[in-house]
Amino acid sequence: MSAVLKPTPVSTADQAIADLSLAAWGRKEIKIAETEMPGLMAIREEFSKAQPLKGARITGSLHMTIQTAVLIETLQALGATVRWASCNIFSTQDHAAAAIAAAGTPVFAIKGESLKDYWDYTHAIFDFGPKGSQGEGPNMILDDGGDATLLMHLGQRAEKDLGVLSKPTSEEERILYAAIKAKLAVDPTWYTRKSAEIIGVTEETTTGVHRLNEMSAKGTLLFRAINVNDSVTKSKFDNLYGCRESLVDGIKRATDVMIAGKVACVAGYGDVGKGSAQALRALSAQVWVTEIDPINALQAAMEGYKVVTMEYAADKADIFVTTTGNRDVIRHEHMAAMKDQAIVCNIGHFDNEIDVASIEKYEWEEIKPQVDHITFPDGKKIILLAKGRLVNLGCGTGHPSFVMSSSFANQTIAQIELFTKPDAYQAGKVYVLPKHLDEKVARLHLKKVGAMLTELTDEQAAYIGVSKNGPYKPDTYRY
């Protein structure tokens, strides 16, 4: 029997991908995705002549998927130059990365890359020009989870005081700190120079927005930020409807498990938790929810879910899903109490929602990529998906193209806003997109789903005190 040879990854100063021969396959899927992403395609049509992003140098840190490829090429169609890396070591679709690389875009993303490679690649997306030149670094960041933004802030602090890198609290922090030290050893002002021309950042996720808000509150945020996550057409669509479809897809691809009849415990009942709970219930699981917020807990109860604690669910549930964006949601004591063959996964953001570090000392057996059996001292095994990272992207292909069109339309519009109107946004502050732009994103997607919009009469508009063309709701309205 002949051995199966894996292709050698391609790595240069302007790309690191798994296999360039996958480019044709990736391009075919990109073409299909474009037909399912009406928001991005409409933005291309509207703005391609005006080139509002001409001169923009965008550092992109976001899952390198087929849908992201459509986003990248939309930004380029509007005049931007981009350098791209994935924001998760398991989320890259190698054929998407290959297609983008083949088109000449600098991209650094390999599914299953090491953490060292991850931070090397995140550094690489800031290298736009020669040292000391105008345009050496980016003038915009497009971020997902905040790692690119974090790197610039932490690196600048380390330039002044290496002591900030002295006490890593996790393996990932240890590797990040080592990467920063290595960069500073050869170039002591690298982070300051790369940040010098950054106008602002647009952030995709709840986790990244939390980081931005924290820095803004402390007065340490170096540039302007737009919180894309809290656009209604992102959080109420991507977070809810996207997770509703991609969670069970990831679990099914990984395990082939029958979900009907199982007890599934969803940690968190925000938008991601709501979508996850709906998906599991649609497949006839008994869904339990854990919550810290009494309002969300009451919402879950009113939807018919049993609201419990993780301590209660640990030895009873069959499937566990974390959706919170917090840390240590499933701890060692919870996993130690679980049933044999319990499935544990995360669709929040970082892998610390599940205390994976506490079970690294046990015996691990890889069933297939991103599916591991972990044997506890008593002989019981649990099935951990994507090593605690995002299950929908680690074990599946992420959200469908249509819902990502809505999210990425927000990202593109936010990039245009910050780049073309920097004086309208104060450095160090975090903003959301104006309501009329949120409504615009929704309008761009109505035709695709066959939706007809009713138009107000002049009398009706006057009666409720709004313009016939919107915005239709106050900023305080909760959709």
Swiss-Prot record:
User: Which top EC class applies here?
Assistant: hydrolase
GO molecular function per UniProt:
adenosylhomocysteinase activity
The alphabetical list of record keywords is: Cytoplasm, Hydrolase, NAD, One-carbon metabolism
- Key word ATP-binding present: no
> According to its UniProt record, where is this protein located?
Cytoplasm
Matching Pfam families: AdoHcyase, AdoHcyase_NAD
Instruction: Name what cofactor the protein needs.
Output: NAD(+)
Q: Name one GO cellular component term.
A: cytosol
The entry marks the following residues as binding NAD(+), namely 205-207, 239, 268-273, 291, 326, 347-349, 392
Q: What highest taxon heads this organism's lineage? A: Bacteria
Any GO BP? S-adenosylmethionine cycle
Q: According to its UniProt record, where is this protein mainly located?
A: cytoplasm
Q: How is the cofactor bound?
A: Binds 1 NAD(+) per subunit.
UniProt pathway = Amino-acid biosynthesis; L-homocysteine biosynthesis; L-homocysteine from S-adenosyl-L-homocysteine: step 1/1
Function summary: May play a key role in the regulation of the intracellular concentration of adenosylhomocysteine.
Q: Which family does it belong to?
A: Belongs to the adenosylhomocysteinase family.
Return the protein name: Adenosylhomocysteinase
Which species is this record about?
A: Variovorax paradoxus (strain S110)
What would be the name of the gene that encodes this protein? ahcY
